[in-house]
Curated annotation (Swiss-Prot):
Tissue specificity annotation: Expressed by the skin glands.
Alphabetized UniProt keyword annotations: Amphibian defense peptide, G-protein coupled receptor impairing toxin, Secreted, Toxin, Vasoactive, Vasodilator
Chief location of this protein within or outside the cell: secreted
Family note: Belongs to the bradykinin-related peptide family.
Function: Produces in vitro relaxation of rat arterial smooth muscle and constriction of intestinal smooth muscle. May target bradykinin receptors (BDKRB).
GO biological process: defense response; vasodilation
One annotated Gene Ontology cellular component of this protein: extracellular region
UniProt name for this protein: [Ala1,Thr6,Ala11]-phyllokinin
Subcellular localization, as worded in the UniProt entry: Secreted
Length: 11
């Protein structure tokens, strides 16, 4: 996964 990737959306 790319750097800063998260499985959740950050608002």
């Amino acid at each position: 996964a790319p750097p800063g990737f998260t499985p959740f959306r950050i608002a």
